[in-house]
Amino acid sequence: MAGQKIRIRLKAYDHEVIDSSAKKIVETVTRTGAKVAGPVPLPTEKNVYCVIRSPHNDKDSREHFEMRTHKRLIDIIDPTPKTVDSLMRLDLPAGVDISIKL
């Protein structure tokens, strides 16, 4: 697999979970002998939802809720077959969304 690059994008609502997952991935890849670039923190996506507090007629009273999506990027340069196999077997938390590009 010489000259290839694997790009892993992680998304999660909790920054502690995403950081621990990125740390697990980096440790696994360095243990198998491939080079790692990252984890690179990407901009946090912030969605704000405005909801009327009262179910009836008071429109001036509103409440704001926000949802933050934290993102990280990890590049694996020159992965070995052992690296790919160990990444497939890696157990990560349920709250992390992973997308992999070759």
Curated annotation (Swiss-Prot):
GO terms for cellular component: ribonucleoprotein complex; ribosome. GO terms for molecular function: structural constituent of ribosome; tRNA binding. The keyword Ribonucleoprotein applies. It comes from the Bacteria. One of its GO terms (biological process) is translation. Pfam families: Ribosomal_S10. Keywords: Ribonucleoprotein, Ribosomal protein. Part of the 30S ribosomal subunit. Involved in the binding of tRNA to the ribosomes. Belongs to the universal ribosomal protein uS10 family. HAMAP family: Ribosomal_uS10. This is Small ribosomal subunit protein uS10.
